[in-house]
Amino acid sequence: WGERRMVPIAGGTFEGPGLKGKVLPGGADRQLIRRDGARSLDAVYELQTHDGVIISVRNKVLVRPPKDGGARYAFSTLEIVAPEGRYGWLNDHVHVGTLDSLRPERAAVVIRVFRLI
């Protein structure tokens, strides 16, 4: 199929409607770099909200290089598990996302997450 890699998740921050906090270090992004140039990513990590609540995330991403001058394809599905209470609503929706690299300036990504209703 291709080359496998594991990239550690060193941390970061997140913010959105009703949520903000930090991405905790210790997660990992397992990657399969396919022979056709596409990448299949499976990232597992935890978030800590500004008020101390831990939320678990599994983000599965497909990244395809641009074809015929088009844009790069980088979309994901996210499984988000939060404890009951203030953030319990996260458990009751389907979430999708986009992924943008910040290279060459930083070895980091921006993930935009959308809740489907």
Where are these regions (language model features)?
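Beta-strand-enriched cores of mature, soluble protein domains
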Residues: W1-I117
